């Protein structure tokens, strides 16, 4: 029989408590004796934000420095803005994107021999003041579609409305609060490849292999006007004109087709305003920017920029060696949501709504004091390119290398500072949106990653894969925040609602799933 050690005596317990107390008293003394450094805060455009200040290395956590910067800027609790910091290594052309647990060790590791007498430059990037929680459980599994779900998108107004397009030739609008179908949108005679809500949430557009575009009223489920006819082949993608640019009392819609053209439609009449022709291959993706430029990516390996008002070509970017699969704009999130933000306050008049949408766009797209959207293109050649369309030259800002297979999908974070890319190499990668530098790999899927979507606060990314799972990633750490099994087959489409409440997914198993915290 095993002999048990006797319990510690009162004296032993008292000595242990005293020893622990002594350690706790000494630890702060040791910690605060790390020395200090001088911090120079700059904004993302390189402008100095405050005077140089001295900070103790022991207190130099990202949270503490964020609080200090707010104090230096004279902000009260109402105006408080959380920041993340990029560290410029002195004497080297090196910027560390992820703030470390131990700043002193990081500087010494990179050869800064005397950090105590060195001024360290910290780029401060504002973070969202609201926080989105990682979705962690299945809210609803909603059957209804008779074939795989190919696309899904939440209404910009609320996560309680979701649209999906399917291989059963229908689109559907779902009530995600109750987990029930609201409307089945019938009319297409081919697969519905894309669904897209207008920025004000008052229309839903669908595009199909039947060569048509249709616009629906999501409140009644009825079609608005006749179907838009003009394309000769499948219609692959849609893009709404940004809300602040709507004119003549009508919205405009762009559609990209396998027939190598893009058409601009007047929504209230269904008339074609312009046909953008020039691509020599299928136009796989289209985006409508906040300065009335239209961006297209094609299987002819080019990315083109068009003037939406005149219908003329502005730039032709040719750098990719294979098909362009997807393109994204740094302003995508604010253009998709127009005047809807985390406050849920909707301006009363049309003029005020326009003004708010324009203000949100200009704030999101500003680089060095001027409005300049960035564009990123993803290709079958395993690469991505970052472009500045305001630059007249056709030279990219950066070439983003690292994927070992085709890059399927790409998205800017809502705050415009990061890029996430999903690839056939089973990985999702994060990149700096300013200079295109690689930041980290999000590895965990065991099959190609088809799509990715950001949370509205830019702190989380959700990915959908051929391996039948969704995964939620913490962007700061690069770690898996939540694994979401539940699909019975490949996950083709994923979206995160603009209000942060829900994630939706759909794929080969034909059922829509919504996920919540």
Curated annotation (Swiss-Prot):
Function of the molecule: Involved in ribosome biogenesis. Required for processing and efficient intra-nuclear transport of pre-60S ribosomal subunits. Interacts with the AAA-ATPase Midasin, which is essential for the ATP-dependent dissociation of a group of nonribosomal factors from the pre-60S particle.
Family recorded in the similarity comment: Belongs to the NLE1/RSA4 family.
Name under which the protein is recorded: Ribosome assembly protein 4
Pfam families in the cross-refs: WD40 (PF00400)
Sorted UniProt keywords: Nucleus, Repeat, Ribosome biogenesis, WD repeat
Repeat recorded as keyword: yes
GO cellular component entries: nucleolus
Region Disordered, residue ranges: 1-25
Predominant location: nucleus
GO biological process, one term: ribosomal large subunit assembly
Subcellular compartments: Nucleus, Nucleolus
Quaternary structure note: Associates with the pre-60S ribosomal particle. Interacts (via WD repeats) with uL18. Interacts (via UBL domain) with MDN1 (via VWFA/MIDAS domain). Interacts (via WD repeats) with NSA2.
WD repeat segments: 144-184, 187-226, 230-277, 278-316, 351-397, 402-441, 444-483, 486-517
Organism: Chaetomium thermophilum (strain DSM 1495 / CBS 144.50 / IMI 039719) (Thermochaetoides thermophila)
């Amino acid at each position: 029989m095993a002999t048990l050690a006797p319990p510690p005596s009162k004296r032993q317990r008292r000595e242990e408590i005293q020893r622990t107390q002594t350690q706790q008293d000494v630890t702060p003394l040791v910690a605060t004796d790390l020395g200090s450094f001088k911090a120079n805060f700059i904004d993302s455009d390189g402008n100095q934000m405050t005077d140089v200040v001295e900070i103790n290395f022991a207190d130099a956590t990202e949270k503490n420095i964020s609080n200090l910067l707010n104090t230096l800027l004279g902000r009260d609790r109402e105006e408080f803005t959380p920041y993340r910091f990029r560290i410029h290594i002195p004497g080297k052309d090196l910027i560390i994107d992820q703030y470390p647990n131990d700043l002193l060790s990081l500087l010494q590791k990179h050869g800064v021999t005397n950090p105590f007498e060195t001024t360290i430059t910290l780029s401060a990037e504002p973070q969202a003041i609201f926080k989105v929680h990682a979705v962690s459980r299945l809210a609803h599994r909603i059957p209804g579609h008779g074939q795989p779900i190919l696309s899904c998108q939440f209404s910009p107004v609320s996560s309680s409305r979701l649209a999906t397009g399917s291989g059963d030739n229908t689109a559907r609008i779902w009530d995600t609060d109750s987990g029930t179908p609201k409307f089945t949108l019938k009319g297409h005679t081919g697969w519905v490849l894309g669904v897209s809500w207008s920025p004000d949430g008052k229309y839903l557009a669908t595009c199909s292999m039947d060569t048509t575009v249709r616009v629906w009223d999501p409140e009644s489920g009825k079609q608005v006007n006749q179907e838009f006819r003009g394309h000769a082949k499948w219609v692959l993608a849609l893009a709404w004109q940004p809300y602040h640019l709507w004119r003549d009392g009508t919205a405009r819609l762009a559609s990209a087709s396998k027939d190598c053209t893009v058409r601009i439609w007047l929504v209230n009449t269904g008339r074609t305003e312009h046909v953008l022709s020039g691509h020599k291959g299928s136009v796989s993706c289209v985006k409508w920017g906040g300065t009335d430029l239209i961006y297209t990516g094609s299987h002819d390996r080019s990315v083109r920029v068009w003037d939406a008002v005149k219908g003329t070509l502005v730039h032709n970017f040719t750098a990719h060696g294979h098909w362009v699969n997807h393109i994204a704009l740094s302003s995508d999130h604010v253009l998709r949501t127009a005047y809807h933000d985390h406050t849920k306050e909707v301006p009363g008049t049309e003029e005020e709504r326009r003004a708010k949408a324009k203000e949100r766009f200009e704030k999101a797209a500003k680089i060095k004091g001027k409005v300049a959207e960035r564009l990123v293109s993803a290709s079958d050649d395993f690469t991505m390119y970052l472009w500045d369309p305001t630059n007249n030259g056709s030279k990219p800002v950066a070439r983003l290398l690292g994927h070992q297979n085709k890059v399927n999908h790409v998205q800017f974070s809502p705050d415009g500072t990061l890029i996430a890319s999903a690839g056939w190499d089973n990985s999702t990668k994060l990149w700096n949106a300013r200079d295109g530098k690689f930041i980290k790999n999000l590895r965990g899927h065991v099959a190609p990653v088809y799509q990715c979507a950001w949370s509205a606060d830019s702190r989380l990314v959700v990915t959908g894969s051929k391996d039948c799972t969704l995964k939620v990633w913490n962007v700061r750490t690069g770690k898996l925040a939540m694994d979401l099994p539940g699909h019975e087959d490949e996950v083709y489409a994923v979206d995160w609602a603009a209000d942060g409440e829900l994630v939706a997914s759909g794929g080969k198993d034909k059922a829509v799933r919504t996920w919540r915290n």
